[in-house]
Amino acid sequence: MWNPILLDTSSFSFQKHVSGVFLQVRNATKRAAGSRTSMKDSAGRRLGPKKYEGQDVSTGEIIMRQRGTKFYPGENVGIGKDHSIFALEPGVVRYYLDPFHPKRKFIGVALRRDLKLPSPHFEPTVRRFGRFELTNKRAAYKEENSISRKDYLAKPNILKQLEVRESKRKELQDKLSKVLRDELKLDIKDIELATSYLIRVRASLKNGYPIEDARFNSRYYLKEEERLKARRESWTNEKLSESLSKIDECSDLLNSSTSFNNKLELHQYISEQEKQALKAKLLEDLEKSQHLETKKDKNYIKALFKDACNFLTLSEEVHLRRKYLKSVFPETDSTVETKSGKKSIVSRRFDYTKNKVEVIARSRRAFLSKL
């Protein structure tokens, strides 16, 4: 095919004998020119079905050769440039009609011999995800124990992290058992069950659960683990019920005698009424000593916050610390100096109204760290 390309002659001038440029466009499907004398008919293309209904096919096998789409591709088959239909999955050939396309005839491949096409419209699609059944026991065992290269390279790091996590969990378990015995002096028969319950509660609190949900989830987890163990080891109903009652007794004792503060540290149980009373007393003491002028005042307010983590939430404690222990105090007559001295702390600030840089001298009492 020849396409003339018209050039813009307004931008530059041509020579006298140049009239235009022609470029040939060649396409992959363009038939070559034939001879006038060769009017012979070519051999047949062997069209028609190559696999019939119910025959087994492998991936890539041609099922139908045709000119045009006499048959349309159905499930698990593809169609080529010459409209040949071929299998995309190993299975059984099915010729069928689709009620959603009543004027078309389809060819598909069923993945199993008991499956019929078309598949039910609202049912899940049957897929292999590139897998096939291994009948050889040795090959099946090898496949079960094989891992990808990416997982193989990451395996040492994963095992190391698991060891670190297990060691941290063991340290936390020892720490909690020491607190239960030495500080709280609780008479607990199964200390391992108690520490495992407290670790689950602490993890739930760390993930943002309320204390009631954390306790419920921890108790439910331990009970479910015990039921699964009983099923594996074929326990009797009496033994299982006795084990579950131990979990209930231990969790009830811990819920009524222990609690976690906002730093996730175990301490003596404090009721909600006691927490509100301690919070009100703390606010009253903080209001009395609002003005920080000396190091003694700073240490006094810090001492008030010493046990605040036991009855305040983390957000409440942070809010109160930012309010009463400000790192930089507001600019007042007592903290702003008219002249800068040797002990003054000078800062420069741009004044947009006056359009100039102001030099502000402040005393050391204006900064909490300098008291």
From Swiss-Prot:
Gene3D superfamilies attached to this UniProt entry: 2.40.50.100
Q: Give first and last residue of the transit peptide.
A: 1-27
The Gene Ontology biological process annotation of the record reads: mitochondrial cytochrome c oxidase assembly; mitochondrial translation
Compartment(s) where it occurs, according to its Swiss-Prot or TrEMBL record: Mitochondrion
- Which Pfam families does the record match to this protein? Ribosomal_L27, Ribosomal_L27_C
Which SUPFAM superfamilies does this one have? Answer: Ribosomal L27 protein-like
Q: Kindly state which keywords UniProt assigns to this record, in alphabetical order.
A: Mitochondrion, Ribonucleoprotein, Ribosomal protein, Transit peptide
MF (Gene Ontology): structural constituent of ribosome
UniProt-listed InterPro entries: Ribosomal_bL27 (IPR001684), Ribosomal_bL27_CS (IPR018261), Ribosomal_bL27m_C (IPR041244)
Keyword Lipid metabolism in annotation: no
- Cellular component per GO, a single term: mitochondrion
Describe the function of this protein: Component of the mitochondrial ribosome (mitoribosome), a dedicated translation machinery responsible for the synthesis of mitochondrial genome-encoded proteins, including at least some of the essential transmembrane subunits of the mitochondrial respiratory chain. The mitoribosomes are attached to the mitochondrial inner membrane and translation products are cotranslationally integrated into the membrane.
The family this protein is said to belong to: Belongs to the bacterial ribosomal protein bL27 family.
Quaternary structure, per UniProt, is: Component of the mitochondrial large ribosomal subunit (mt-LSU). Mature yeast 74S mitochondrial ribosomes consist of a small (37S) and a large (54S) subunit. The 37S small subunit contains a 15S ribosomal RNA (15S mt-rRNA) and 34 different proteins. The 54S large subunit contains a 21S rRNA (21S mt-rRNA) and 46 different proteins.
Further remark: Present with 2300 molecules/cell in log phase SD medium.
Q: What is this protein called?
A: Large ribosomal subunit protein bL27m
- Which organism encodes this protein? Saccharomyces cerevisiae (strain ATCC 204508 / S288c)
Q: Which gene encodes it?
A: MRP7
